[in-house]
């Protein structure tokens, strides 16, 4: 037969690829009586190409979750003589989310969620770097210092800070340790090693005095000592600072809370540096 007679025709409406749903044979979409996906022999083998001019079908709806109906499943259960409701909920997300509203059909079914949040938060990482269910803190609110290292019990405010700290514990089972060529320190990831090597190479150099730093923001704060720029101003008084950390320490003097107390005398201080200076001066010298 000449090749000119071989004409491939396409459907005017896009049909869903029910063949992909065969992987859900053991999920909620299958019959609980015979474990067979009802109507699977009627499913098409391939999906027709999408034409933008075609009218939208229910399976093209993807605003949040669009559901596909399988009306063959209830009829299939009736032929088996099985009574009772069949739990059917499987979510389907189609390719044209912005063009159609969400459509929910009867007897639809929902896919299991891709992400299940833990019942308790915040978590504490165990020795293997995984979440330990029995070590999670009670409640769901994040409190300061709620992320604790299981190795040295050092508290952290965020999970990201705890993850960066645990790079120092090279005995974590990562399968490979990265050793610094300048010292004997080891790290669990290559990224942590590269950040550490910058403390040896000091690539950020001041063009005014030649002083070198490991981080760009450290160099930027140092340049302010040459220019005299103090962009961080206190909202309570007229004092300004070149570094944000100095402003945070200064704000403690306005709050009125002095949590650093001397162990010898009843004096208290708002900053740890002031307490250290007080102790070095000898608040209560002995005989």
UniProtKB/Swiss-Prot annotation:
Annotated region described as SNAG domain, given as residue ranges: 1-20
Pfam families: zf-C2H2
ZnF C2H2-type: positions: 147-169, 178-200, 204-226, 232-254, 260-282
The keyword Manganese appears for this protein: no
Matches recorded under InterPro entries: Snail/Krueppel_Znf, Znf_C2H2_sf, Znf_C2H2_type
Entry's family note: Belongs to the snail C2H2-type zinc-finger protein family.
Protein name: Zinc finger protein SNAI3
Record organism: Mus musculus
Lineage: Eukaryota, Metazoa, Chordata, Craniata, Vertebrata
